[in-house]
UniProtKB/Swiss-Prot annotation:
Gene that encodes the chain: atpC
Record has ATP-binding as a keyword: no
Compartments where found: Cell inner membrane
Taxonomy of the source species: Bacteria, Pseudomonadati, Pseudomonadota, Gammaproteobacteria, Oceanospirillales
Cross-referenced PANTHER family: ATP SYNTHASE DELTA/EPSILON CHAIN, ATP SYNTHASE EPSILON CHAIN, CHLOROPLASTIC
Keyword terms of this UniProt record: ATP synthesis, Cell inner membrane, Cell membrane, CF(1), Hydrogen ion transport, Ion transport, Membrane, Transport
GO cellular component terms attached to this protein's record: plasma membrane; proton-transporting ATP synthase complex
Protein's recorded name: ATP synthase epsilon chain
Molecular functions (GO terms): ATP binding; proton-transporting ATP synthase activity, rotational mechanism
InterPro entries: ATP_F1_dsu/esu_C_sf, ATP_synth_F1_dsu/esu, ATP_synth_F1_dsu/esu_N, ATP_synth_F1_esu_C, ATPsynth_dsu/esu_N
Amino acid sequence: MAMTVHCDIVSAERQLFSGLVEIVVASGVEGDLGIMPGHAPLLTRLKPGPVRVKKQNGEEEVFYVSGGFLEVQPKLVTVLADTAERAENMDAAEAERAKARAKEALEGKSSEMDYSRAAATLIEAVAQLRAIQQLKNKR
């Protein structure tokens, strides 16, 4: 039986996952992280993108987080997300449309505020698509 660590993935709205996992993979601001049992304590900010967990039965689940924090304690890994969603519940077509709208808004550059908002929307749409793609790749 593989070693495991307890993992909780929560957003402001709800808890999305709680259980024993063999590994948690997430995108931190300093790069990608793979957290396994026995990992050193850590606190880092998360970039928008996928968070992947491999459960003790070998099954993988993929979540999208819009950012937040990842905390590693000796027996617990916690993902505190600004917003989060199971990748299987996400709509790839809607994410593609949001990406296209954001690119179009960036090309218009009507004001600095609009540009910043469009850039943030583009980053989020691309991150959502990465989460959906990871889900497809695991199947």
